[in-house]
Amino acid sequence: MQQTVLTSSGAPGAPAIVVRSFEAEGPAPAQASIVIGPAMGVRQDFYAGFAQWLAGQGFRVSTFDYRGVGASLDALGRNSPRGVQADLTDWAQDYEAVVTHARQALPGAPLYLLGHSLGAQLPGFFRHPEQVDGLVSVAAGSGYWRDNAPRLKRTVLYFWHVLVPLATRLCGYFPGRRLRKVGDLPAGVILQWRRWCLDPRYSVGAEGAAAEQSYARVRFPVLALSITDDELMTARGTRNLLALYPNAPQRIDPIAPADVQVRRIGHFGLFRSQFAGTLWPCTIDSLRALATLPAATAARVPPTTA
């Protein structure tokens, strides 16, 4: 594993993005490059075992931390994201900088995104989506609060209307680790995410026509793995996320715990080592299936509102 520090702009003094690269193992050239887009508040360390396993299957894999999170925060010499200037648009630029770096490292091979939750939402803001050959989304959906899973929905309005504004104002960032909610986040990130999650059309509704046009530029195929016992997302939320990508060939594949003879998978489970012999190989099947998604399926997932 090799660690690199990037900046999204390349300019001196720009925020650090710490990237870890796992080179494909074995004598054969890498089959493809994979960039794992992390979920909100999740450090890249969480994906390390899965990334190493993918490298063992012949893929070059990149993981990273958005600015103000994990190793990227450590690179700033800070112990909290207080004062870190970042929002979700900046995070999309960070993500795309990692994609560009991965493309340059392996220019002749396909490049796929494996987006966990937020990691499947932000590619709609890429300035150059043509760099990407496909996206497998994992446990991802619209974050609109009415699309949340039933148990989460019971408390989420308190979270957005009381806890987030109050805690962020008091601390100068969102102290999610202390509150056991999401994770520590820069103020600009959590407050923009709040706007998205309170809008029925999520990011596109909150950001307007420019965001809608940006998502419409995405032409790469999207295959969504929808976890049926996800404690945060719902199938409707997944459908609504895919509806934001109107010109992308797309498909939803549900995964239930019974499919792999376990009691629970949940929002984070697919990346845990207990599924190395079951769900991890399924992700490779999903990556290979991207090329088979016909363009005729694009924009065929109708948006829903409630």
Spans of features found by a protein language model:
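N-terminal cap/lid segment of alpha/beta-hydrolase-fold proteins
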Residues: 1-26
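Active-site glycine-rich loops that stabilize anionic/oxyanionic intermediates
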Residues: 36-42
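Short alpha-helix in the alpha/beta-hydrolase fold that links the catalytic acid
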Residues: 233-244
